Amino acid sequence: MDNKLTKDIRIPVSLCDHTGHLDIPGFFTIFMDMASEHATDINIGMDNLGEKGLIWLAVKSKFRFYSKPKMFSTVTATTWPAEPARIRADRLYKMEQDGQLIAEGKNEWAIFHPESGKLVKFAEVYPADFIHWDEIVCEGRYAKLKDNFDDAEEIGRYTVASGDLDTSRHMNNVEYLKVIFSAFTSLQLEEMNVAEVDITYKNQCYEGEELILKRKISEDGCEIGIIKADGTAGAIAKITLR
């Protein structure tokens, strides 16, 4: 049982922006796909949990970006789980090109039992003989993001479509990032030198829901709230610029 998954990936057109480089949601897409694959390899994937009536629940993410690889160039991406706490666990990620670190990240996960509405202890489903890879990347705490966007600027609206859903029939984690970055014009994106993205998932969003995107400007970037019709936040992101 491999305690990490490493892949050489040729950057596809479908994950690139108009400049011909891997876009920010593209980084997330690669990493989340690898996380799902590796979880399956170590017998804690979506299908494995589904047999027990459980699902993975993304809580929050932090990713740092140092350069964006060009379309059709090759990168080496790696993911591995950190040793879990009682009901929360981090999964770690890094991407390298020509021996240089170009992105690193982590996200916090929980295991959820939808029928009871409770979180499940990792010890109940985690392989007891698993030996963890001990490398640490993306050090530092997750951002503490508040969901008060009452006075924030509205920058767009989005209706959750069928193509945004995951197997649990709520909005896929990566789709939140796609919605956020699609709210900016191509010129704005060119001017944004993104150093770090934090995102906290607050409430699940479902097909047909209209979401309001609100922005609060800060000295080093901005915070984006994805706000549901009832005023609660679906997700909150902090974009830190260089």
Tell where the protein language model's regions lie, with residue ranges.
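HotDog/MaoC-like acyl-thioester-processing domains
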Residues: 2-7, 62-66, 70-146, 201, ...
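Short, well-ordered turn and helix-capping elements at secondary-structure junctions
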Residues: 13-15, 67, 162, 198-203
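Exposed loop/turn and edge beta-strand positions of beta-sandwich/beta-sheet ligand-binding modules
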Residues: 59, 89, 195
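Solvent-exposed, well-ordered amphipathic alpha-helical segments
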Residues: 150-156, 183-190, 212-222, 238-242
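A conserved acidic, glycine/proline-rich C-terminal tail/linker
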Residues: 187, 191-215
